[in-house]
C-alpha cells in the first residue's frame, strides 16, 4: 500500500517522554498512537522532552533512537523543557498578578494526613496554607520550610471532552505551580508548552485523565486554548499493574536481545491495537480511533512478553 498523507489542517499533536529511563512497550505503544492520531488528522507531530526533573544520562538519545526504530518521525527540533523555564515563570507571574497564587509550606506527609479538603473534593489539597497571615508565613520561613507556590483555584471541578471517554468532569484544587525546590511543576509546564507549541491534540495514557481537568482549568485562567484530548489505555502486566523492569523484556533493547527486530516489536504493538503489521505510514489511510481497543493491553511474562487476552 502506498504511503498516505492526510491533508494538513494546522495544529499539532505531540509525544512528551521524560528521560528517566528507556521507553518500555507501553510508552512505545502510546507514542505510536499519538503519532497516528496526529498524522491521520493532518496535524504536525512534535516531540518534547520533559526533563525538568530526574534525568538519566543517555536516556534521551536512546528514546529518540527507539522511536525512529519503530518508524516514527517528528516535525521540527526536539524541545526540552529545561530550556523553557522563563516561559513558566512568565505564566506564574501572570497568575500572581491576578491574585491567583499563594505560598504553601506543607510537607507531602502533612497533605496525606489531612482527612478532608474544606474547600475542595475529597483527596484534594486541604488548603492548609491558603489563608495564612503574614505572621504565619514568617513563622514558617523562620522554621526553614521551603515554600511551594500554589494556584488559588476558584472552583472545585472542571469538565473536559475526551475523544475516547466523552465528557469527563474531574476535581480541580490548588495545584502546585512551582515546587519547593524551585522547579516549575508538571501541570503548569505542560499547559504552557502545549499552547506555545501550537499543540491542539493531546494523546496520552489514560492514567493522566484525572489530572486533565486541572490542566484545562489552568489553561483557561492563563487565557490559553484547551487542546482536544484522547486518553488511551495503558499496557499492564499480568497482575494489572503498570509495566516495570521486573516484568521481563519490557524495552525495545530487551526485545532485540531476545531476538526480535524493531519491525517485529512494531507488529506486536499494532496487533494489540487491532491494526495490521505495517509501517506506521501505511496505517494512516484506514486509521479510525473509534475502532481502537478501550481496555488495557495485558501482557504476561514468558520471557518475550507475549500478549494475553484481557480478563
From Swiss-Prot:
Q: Which residues bind ATP?
A: 245
**What does it do?**
Catalyzes the tRNA-independent activation of glutamate in presence of ATP and the subsequent transfer of glutamate onto a tRNA(Asp). Glutamate is transferred on the 2-amino-5-(4,5-dihydroxy-2-cyclopenten-1-yl) moiety of the queuosine in the wobble position of the QUC anticodon.
Binding residues for L-glutamate: 14-18, 50, 186, 204
Which cysteines pair up through disulfides? They are none
Organism lineage string: Bacteria, Bacillati, Actinomycetota, Actinomycetes, Mycobacteriales
- Is ATP-binding among this UniProt entry's keywords? yes
Q: What is its EC number?
A: 6.1.1.-
Its required cofactor(s), as named, are: Zn(2+)
What protein name applies here? Glutamyl-Q tRNA(Asp) synthetase
Q: Which PROSITE patterns match?
A: AA_TRNA_LIGASE_I
Q: Which UniProt keywords apply?
A: Aminoacyl-tRNA synthetase, ATP-binding, Ligase, Metal-binding, Nucleotide-binding, Zinc
According to the UniProt entry, where does the motif 'HIGH' region sit in this chain? Answer: 17-27
User: Motif range for 'KMSKS' region?
Assistant: 242-246
One Pfam family in the UniProt entry: tRNA-synt_1c
Q: Where does Zn(2+) bind?
A: 104, 106, 125, 129
Q: How is the cofactor bound?
A: Binds 1 zinc ion per subunit.
Amino acid at each position: 500500500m502506498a504511503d498516505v498523507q492526510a491533508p494538513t489542517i494546522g495544529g499539532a499533536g505531540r509525544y512528551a517522554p521524560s528521560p528517566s529511563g528507556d521507553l518500555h512497550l507501553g510508552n512505545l505503544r502510546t507514542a505510536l498512537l499519538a503519532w497516528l492520531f496526529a498524522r491521520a488528522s493532518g496535524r504536525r507531530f512534535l516531540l518534547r522532552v520533559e526533563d525538568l526533573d530526574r534525568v538519566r544520562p543517555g536516556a534521551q538519545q536512546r528514546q529518540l533512537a527507539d522511536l525512529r526504530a519503530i518508524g516514527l518521525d517528528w516535525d521540527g527540533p526536539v524541545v526540552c523543557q529545561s530550556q523553557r523555564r522563563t516561559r513558566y515563570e512568565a505564566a506564574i507571574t501572570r497568575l500572581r498578578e491576578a491574585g491567583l497564587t499563594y505560598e504553601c509550606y506543607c510537607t507531602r506527609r502533612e497533605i496525606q494526613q489531612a482527612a478532608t479538603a474544606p474547600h475542595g473534593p475529597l483527596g484534594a489539597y486541604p488548603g492548609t496554607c491558603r489563608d495564612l497571615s503574614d505572621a504565619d508565613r514568617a513563622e514558617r520561613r523562620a522554621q526553614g520550610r521551603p515554600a511551594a507556590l500554589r494556584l488559588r483555584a476558584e472552583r472545585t471541578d472542571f469538565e473536559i471532552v475526551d475523544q475516547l471517554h466523552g465528557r469527563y468532569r474531574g476535581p480541580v484544587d490548588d495545584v502546585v505551580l512551582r515546587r519547593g525546590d524551585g522547579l516549575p511543576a508538571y501541570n503548569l509546564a505542560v499547559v504552557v508548552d502545549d499552547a506555545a507549541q501550537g499543540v491542539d491534540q493531546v494523546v496520552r495514557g489514560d492514567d493522566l485523565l484525572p489530572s486533565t481537568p486541572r490542566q484545562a482549568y489552568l489553561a483557561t485562567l492563563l487565557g490559553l486554548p484547551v487542546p482536544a484530548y484522547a486518553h488511551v489505555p495503558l499496557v499492564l502486566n499480568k497482575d494489572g499493574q503498570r509495566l516495570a523492569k521486573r516484568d521481563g523484556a519490557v524495552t525495545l533493547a530487551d526485545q532485540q536481545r531476545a531476538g526480535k527486530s524493531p519491525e517485529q516489536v512494531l507488529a506486536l504493538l499494532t496487533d494489540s491495537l487491532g491494526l495490521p503489521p505495517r509501517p506506521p505510514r501505511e496505517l494512516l489511510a484506514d486509521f479510525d480511533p473509534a475502532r481502537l481497543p478501550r481496555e488495557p493491553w495485558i501482557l504476561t511474562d514468558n520471557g518475550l512478553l507475549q500478549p494475553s487476552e484481557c480478563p
